[in-house]
């Protein structure tokens, strides 16, 4: 699909803007969600947000400490993986992060979900093409249900 340059904002700038504005999510949730995948549980990104805790600072601190503990566990869990396995794990996370599109849409001021999907797909494919070998890209993009069991060598 060809898009007019004036109709879209350069997606690399958008991704960089999103990453900059979402550091409080990324620092804690990237590894927490990798751990969640390994453990078969889900970490709700909204719980990390300052505006999502009804009981104020105490809940935020408890959630932060929980995630910090999970980060320690994920560090140990991925330590023995080789580089190829880590690549699969990262692309698996990319696929799962797409579920958090409302966060990215808000940061990027995208009003149309279709624009978001096009932007995301372009960014994911370009990211994969630039940083990962073709076999991994094909396996990840053709199977969005890829899970960490593949990383662990169990098919």
Regions from the PLM with identified roles:
Residues 96-115:
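Helix-turn-helix DNA-binding module
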Residues 92-93, 108, 120:
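A general structural motif at alpha-helix termini
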Residues 79, 93-94:
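Short, locally clustered residues in the helix-turn-helix/winged-helix DNA-binding domain
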Residues 88-89:
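A short pre-motif secondary-structure segment
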Residues 116-134:
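DNA major-groove recognition helices of helix-turn-helix
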Residues 95-96, 126:
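A short structural micro-motif
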Residues 1-80, 109, 132-155:
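N-terminal interaction/assembly modules
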């Amino acid at each position: 699909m060809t898009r007019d340059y004036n109709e879209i904002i350069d997606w690399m700038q958008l991704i960089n803007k999103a990453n900059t504005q979402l550091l409080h999510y990324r620092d804690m949730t990237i590894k927490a969600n990798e751990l969640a995948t390994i453990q078969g549980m889900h970490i709700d990104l909204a719980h990390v947000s300052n505006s999502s805790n009804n009981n104020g600072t105490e809940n935020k601190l408890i959630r932060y400490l929980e995630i910090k503990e999970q980060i320690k566990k994920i560090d140990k869990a991925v330590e023995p993986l080789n580089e190829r396995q880590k690549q699969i794990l990262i692309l698996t996370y990319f696929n799962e992060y797409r579920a958090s599109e409302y966060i990215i849409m808000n940061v990027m001021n995208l009003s149309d979900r279709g624009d978001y999907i096009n932007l995301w797909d372009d960014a994911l494919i370009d990211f994969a093409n630039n940083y990962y070998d073709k076999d991994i890209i094909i396996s990840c993009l053709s199977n969005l249900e890829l899970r960490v069991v593949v990383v662990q060598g169990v098919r």
